[in-house]
Amino acid sequence: MEDAEPNLDILSSAADALAGHYARGTYNELASLLPAVVQSAHQHVQALDGHERRRAHRLRADILVSAGRWLIQVREHDLALMALRDALTDALTADDPVFAAAVVPVQSWALLRQARFDEVEKLCERTADKVEPTKLSKATPDELGAWGHLLLWASAAAARNNRPEEAADYLRAAAAAAARLGRETEVTGRRPFGPLTVAMKEVENILISGRPDRALQLAEQLPQDVGLTYSLAVHRHRIDVAKSQVLLGDAEAATGTLAELRSTVPGWLRHQQSAREVAEDILAARTRMPSAEQRDLADFLGVPA
């Protein structure tokens, strides 16, 4: 891509390829493509002008978001924040405020990994106030998704900061946005948003509050037939289910839940610290020798058996 003439359609396809690898958890492939695609994006921005340059900025923002997400997964949080800062600048330069708003939750993810809970809540609340639709009934799906995801991350930060009432308030507002969509919809930022996304965040918040029994009850009552069966959000939710299971003393069920994820998204699961913590809990909960499956799972996740 480095020596080719500018071609925004090819660059767009490359951005799609990066996002696809991220969504499938094929991180080695993403990492091998990323340097050339980022370099090509820089060259496109430098070589083009006018409308085409704005489009190049928008595509580079998309590419940098994929880079930022991958860097978070491999725990390079400072580098991720640098990439996401540049993505936000590109989105604003491209005059795409909805995409700019969609970058903020990804920034928030990196900040949460650094336990910067107050900062995340304030950032998301402030940005949500700026992009809140005047009337939900007239908002586009992308506008609802951008606003809703900001509220979900504000809720996540509040829940982790021992502010359950505020977390619930943010979640209720996000649920109102999701209700307008009625079903899961892919929105700007290559993420789904809808009733299931909000319901899974509620399970996460309840688990964080120390109520694994209630978390499992809610997990069994998730909205059905709303258009989303496979996404990283669903996989992340299944780790919450496994965590709830082991906390309630059902190490066998938790093992089965993680084993299903290993079968479905092994590359993604291997990078999940939360999955490693569940595996540690499974081993600690055993009153006898761990099973072969549990030892194998622990080895896969890098947990001493």
Question: Where does each model-flagged region fall?
Answer:
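Conserved binding/catalytic microenvironments
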Residues: 2-305
